[in-house]
Amino acid sequence: MIQIILTWHQISESLWRRRLPFLLAGLLLLLSMLPACGPSSDELEAVNYAPLAVGDWQVSTPEEQGLDPMLVAELYHNAAELETLYGLLVIKDGRLIAEDYFNEGSVEQKALLQSAAKSITSALVGIALDRGCLSSVDQKMLEFFPEFSGQIDDPRKREITIRDMLQMRAGYPPEESDSALWEAVWSGDYAHLVADFPLTSDPGSAFQYSNLTTHWLGIIVARACKSDLESFGQQVLFDSLNAEIGSWRKDLDGYNWAAGEIHLSARDAAKFGLLYLNEGEFEGTQVVPAAWVNDSLQSYSLPAHDNIGEFHDIGYGYQWWSATVGDHPVNFAWGHGGQLIVLLDELDMVIVVTADPFYEVYGSESWRHEKAMFDLVGEFIASLPAA
């Protein structure tokens, strides 16, 4: 019998060899959990985000407006990685301090803002009230659709007010909740759906995001003010901003699709954001009543949406969204594909994103790109110091 005596050194070496694969696997797992290194200072200094020397915007720099230029440089460095981003603008203290265009975007491009148009429609409701076309947000919806009065089977529809519609609390469901309803949205024939579309909640009782509800708001403004929505909007809103609507799609009855389908340049979208940041005033002219702006930016439904990256506590006002990003309260217009007009009142800042609108394309792939726009803007805002 041969007796084998292992020294302590031999035992330790044997244990070490057995454990080595597990230790290496653990180390790799730990490294994978660490945040990736950000861009170097040299890379950030090479980023060019200076506003283009065209148009009527007053321009400045982050330094002149008290903002860390490296934070802005990192924003634009990250933006360059996004394959569906078109335009990215930052306005601080009323001045354009950063601007760049990517992929198919350009300063001349009239981008399809998708549902960010809803916030514009809300502004036109406020102006219609101010001009006397409408008398109150408590007017009933069916007052403006008398041709369907005899076709209303659900008596609750007679109680729907303009206020309910503005707050997305009219009782009409999200169209994507039912394939037949979704098909109706793309039919191009909308007015009669006031009568035909079913309610799924009592008016005023619950938030339900409905494209048709906003479109009917646009029809109400057009009928009350005796003008198509695009002409009215250009005359009473965008002319005052020295801005121009590129186009605004119409339905089969000739009404502009008030829930979306408007084309604006990124710079003109930024002017609209600046208008709301300044309580409806633009270059000394009160374009939208200040009280209307204040009412529009309140949160009447909270939460109105799940958190999106850094965007938490998402609420809804009069066709405007609200959220908290980091320590900063924000309001924002939001369209499919990642169109964003973000207002930071405490920092006197507007951020505009235009992107591939993914026209008639929905699902996980379009949402992945859309969320990337939220992540881009949200991480930048969260990095900003408090005012």
Language model features: what each stretch is:
Residues 243-245, 297-350:
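Active-site Gly/Thr loop motif
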Residues 94, 111-137, 165, 217-221, ...:
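Active-site SXXK
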Residues 112, 131-170, 196, 225-260, ...:
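Active-site helix/loop module of the DD-peptidase/beta-lactamase fold
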